[in-house]
């Protein structure tokens, strides 16, 4: 199924982006087929959707064009957007508001979108810089951890992104955004835990945390149980 999905992923994605360009529907690309390039074997990536942020005043127009392309809504995100799917299997998520409830997150995540720049091929659409794309993933992972909705695949995608690009990113920019979101300890802890999960001692990015292993045990329990067990060892996660 993953191989088959990969064959239609990029063509279906480009069909949507080209349609939005043709009818001048603006959008910011939050996640795309590029996630498959994080994996040594692209077919081992999840069958994840194209994710788009669309200004509220153009949202229903965009939604209508997706209906015309054969997409149907199979899940609503009340107050934020919806998940759509086509018979061939390709999925797209569209948002008119970013899916975060806290005031601080809304403010600073929106500022990431405001930094997006026009795509070279489809200039009516905007894309995130390398740093903003990483920050969106990290901030969303932290938010999902705090709301007990963090999936292992999401954490793996984040870790592979960091592993592949951390030397190319502007650390000063990342540190400033992490401080704004108040996720300094949580973001670092998620990366360290992912490193323990998804790497070997030989290719690990971080030293083994001998003195704080109980913290990672609690975090692991919380993720694997969707919050039914696992102490709040990180104060940031309780806010």
Question: How should these model regions be labeled?
Answer:
Residues 1-48, 54-239:
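Conserved NTP-donor binding/palm subdomain of two-metal-ion nucleotidyltransferases/polymerases, i.e.
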């Amino acid at each position: 199924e993953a191989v088959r999905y990969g064959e239609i992923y990029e063509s279906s994605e480009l069909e949507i982006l080209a349609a939005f360009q043709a009818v001048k529907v603006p959008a910011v690309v939050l996640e795309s087929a590029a996630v498959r390039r994080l994996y040594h074997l692209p077919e081992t990536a999840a069958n994840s959707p194209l994710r788009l942020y669309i200004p509220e005043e153009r949202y229903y127009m965009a939604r209508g064009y997706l209906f015309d392309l054969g997409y149907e809504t199979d899940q609503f995100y009340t107050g934020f957007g919806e998940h759509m799917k086509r018979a061939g299997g390709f999925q797209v998520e569209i948002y008119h508001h970013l899916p975060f409830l806290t005031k601080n997150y809304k403010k600073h995540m929106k500022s990431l979108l405001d930094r997006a720049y026009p795509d070279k091929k489809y200039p009516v659409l905007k894309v995130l810089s390398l740093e903003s794309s990483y920050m969106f993933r990290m901030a969303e992972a932290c938010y999902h951890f705090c709301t007990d909705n963090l999936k292992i695949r999401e954490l793996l995608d984040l870790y592979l992104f960091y592993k592949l690009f951390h030397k190319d990113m502007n650390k000063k920019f990342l540190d400033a955004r992490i401080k704004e979101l108040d996720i300094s300890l949580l973001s670092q802890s998620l990366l360290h835990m992912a490193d323990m999960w998804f790497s070997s001692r030989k290719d690990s990015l971080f030293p083994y945390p001998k003195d704080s292993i109980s913290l990672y045990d609690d975090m692991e329990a919380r993720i694997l149980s969707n919050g039914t067990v696992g102490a709040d060892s990180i104060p940031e996660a309780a806010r």
